[in-house]
A protein has these predicted regions:
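Positively charged, low-complexity, intrinsically disordered RNA-binding extensions
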Residues: 139-242
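N-terminal cationic and glycine-rich segments that engage phosphates or anionic surfaces
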Residues: 1-125, 130-141, 181, 238
Length: 242
């Protein structure tokens, strides 16, 4: 199961530079609110909140900022409220794109997402128009440099905990699970001292689309860049073979 992953570069990764860090912190803050309101402020009893905290720490969010966010979300007078909205559509040459958002204004978000597709010569479709082309999987990303285990030991630890697949990339490892098993596998890896960069439910494409002409490449990048710049967008999944 180890070796080069066909899933490499499937998710449009957000750059962790100064310009993007503010957006990442905004997204994580909203995810903390959603997690606390759904399952309470105690991460020991709230697996989703544990996942968000792990994501926050991987993105170097200060612990006091995380704690303030949890306390604020748990407060009786907290007025923060966000809805999850998912949009599906097509990029150039039929590239399938799924956009996940957390928003306090669905009309604004829908307009911005539609605008991103339009400017890249893509189109928004109906719910379900492309999601059938993806498999929902638990996805755990591990930094090679930070991991003291070798690939074989890490793979066995993950598989013994219930993982479905293990892939080795140039600078990271990827562990895939059934969505319902993500928490158990994450906890087993954490208990073994494995530092996690990310643990989330991901949309993994069943097949990929290659783009070769310059216009299509510019169009898809335009769509992804505009979505990346939108503070309401939390994740973008696509089947472009980058």
């Amino acid at each position: 199961m180890s070796g080069h992953s066909k899933f490499a570069n499937i998710k449009h990764k957000k750059e962790k530079n100064d310009a993007k860090k503010g957006k990442i912190f905004t997204i994580i803050g909203r995810e903390i609110v959603m997690a606390v309101k759904a399952g309470g402020p105690d991460p020991n009893n709230n697996g989703k909140l544990r996942d968000v905290i792990a994501k926050a720490q991987a993105n170097n969010m200060p612990n006091d900022t995380i704690e303030r966010g949890i306390k604020k979300a748990a407060g009786a007078d907290s007025a923060d409220s966000y809805e999850k909205a998912v949009y599906e559509g097509y990029g150039p040459n039929g590239v399938a794109i799924i956009v996940e958002t957390l928003t306090d204004n669905k009309n604004r978000t829908a307009s911005n997402v539609r605008n991103a597709f339009t400017k890249g010569n893509g189109s928004i479709g109906t719910q379900g128009c492309v999601s059938y082309m993806f498999d929902q999987k638990g996805q755990i990303i591990i930094d090679k440099e930070e991991c003291e285990m070798d690939a074989d030991e890490l793979m066995m630890t993950a598989l013994d905990a219930g993982a479905e697949d293990f892939n080795e990339e140039e600078d990271s490892y990827e562990v895939l699970t059934a969505p319902d098993d993500l928490g158990a596998v994450r906890e087993a890896l954490e208990a073994a001292g494995v530092p996690l960069l990310e643990a989330q439910v991901a949309m993994i494409p069943q097949t990929t689309v290659e783009l070769t002409d310059e216009k299509s490449l510019k169009d898809i990048q335009r769509i992804l860049d505009l979505l990346d710049d939108d503070d309401d967008v939390t994740d973008v999944w696509h089947n472009w073979d980058e």
